[in-house]
């Protein structure tokens, strides 16, 4: 298992193979990830705790509660946020960890 600290919280990568990656993401309250898309990467997330805000390209928001899932296809613009309290999610994806195109970022990352 490998922990990766992020400005919005951290990731615990618990599985990493040539075919898939499994991560647990902890998003601190009041933080959000970049508005982004992936050219190749496909991912499914499962909410463990907290209310996850999922933003799309048009700014629409979907709120997900513990036990709910969300699938992200390649080229689908998305952003995850923890607006009300800290959020923990499980993410299972294809192994393309560096496949991130950031459109907006609260922390100045490109």
Locations of regions flagged by a protein language model:
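Short acidic-glycine-tyrosine-enriched beta hairpin
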Residues: 58-77
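Double-stranded beta-helix
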Residues: 2-6, 79-110
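Structural motif
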Residues: 32, 44, 51, 77, ...
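A short glycine-rich, His/Asp/Glu-containing loop-to-beta-strand
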Residues: 1-41
